[in-house]
Amino acid sequence: MDTSQHHTRDDLDLLTRHWEPAGPAKATMLLVHGLSEHSGRWDHVARFFAAAGYDTHGFDLRGHGLSDGAHIDVDRFDVFVGDVAEMVVEVRSELPLVIYGHSMGGLITTLYAVSDHPQPDLYVLSAPALGADVAVPLRIAASVLGRAVPGLRMGTGLRGEQLSRDPKVGEAYFADPLVYIKGTARFGAALLGVMPEAAEAVGAIRVPTLVIHGGDDTVVPPWASEPLAAVPGVERRVWPGLRHEMHNEPERDEVLGFVAVWLDDHLREA
């Protein structure tokens, strides 16, 4: 795995990672990680797909991990979409391109999928954050705080056991100095505001897409990805009993193997 930096249009440096397959690559994959985490937490996933013949790339979102930017502090999500667009230009080759987004990264990837930016050949959306179980009073409070005290920092409220049934996953998450667990009120308001916008726009997706979700996900509940199931060319698979980070569950090999087979089948059809 090699690391480098991508310099953005607004003069930020984003940490990038590259996992090169040992033999000829069948496709290029761009990983888009979730809220608070960083692309280094996806090392085992990237190695899995590199071993399967995918030239795999990841990057730390702005304000995350080792990338520039105030930690978890944006007021609009189009800046993330713009960063994905820049990364697509950087990693794209003559090979087919797959974008794989998880959780908030799945939300960002969905926003990219319905945009006018050049599209990849395939998408994988893992627990895409198109909705959340947030009570109306809390939504109102987030909106008010986002305007009144936009820089106020609040914890995400995430518990380690929500990520995986393997307790070591949560322990490692909270012990990781590159995981930032507090975001600004401005960011929270932007996140809650863009979720329904993305959910309403999914009909504009025109690229074959695989949606995967854990049936016991309490971070992004399974109902959040249901709108995608009605879109032509989208296949949705829910794993009963699995939690938010299916790639970190005991059944991770089954989940990643399913994704790899789906990708291989659709690459052959392309």
Per-region residue spans from a language model:
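Short beta-strand/loop motif that positions the catalytic acidic residue
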Residues: I205, V211-H213, D217
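Catalytic active-site module of serine/aspartate enzymes centered on a nucleophile-bearing elbow/loop
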Residues: E235-A270
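Conserved alpha/beta-hydrolase "acid-adjacent" motif
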Residues: T218-A224
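Short glycine-enriched nucleophile-adjacent loop
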Residues: G106-H117, Y123
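Catalytic nucleophile-loop/oxyanion-hole region of alpha/beta-hydrolase
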Residues: S36-S39, G65-V91, V255
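Serine-hydrolase catalytic-loop signature spanning alpha/beta hydrolases and amidase-signature enzymes
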Residues: G34-H44, T56
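N-terminal cap/lid segment of alpha/beta-hydrolase-fold proteins
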Residues: M1-G23
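Conserved alpha/beta-hydrolase
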Residues: A46-G69
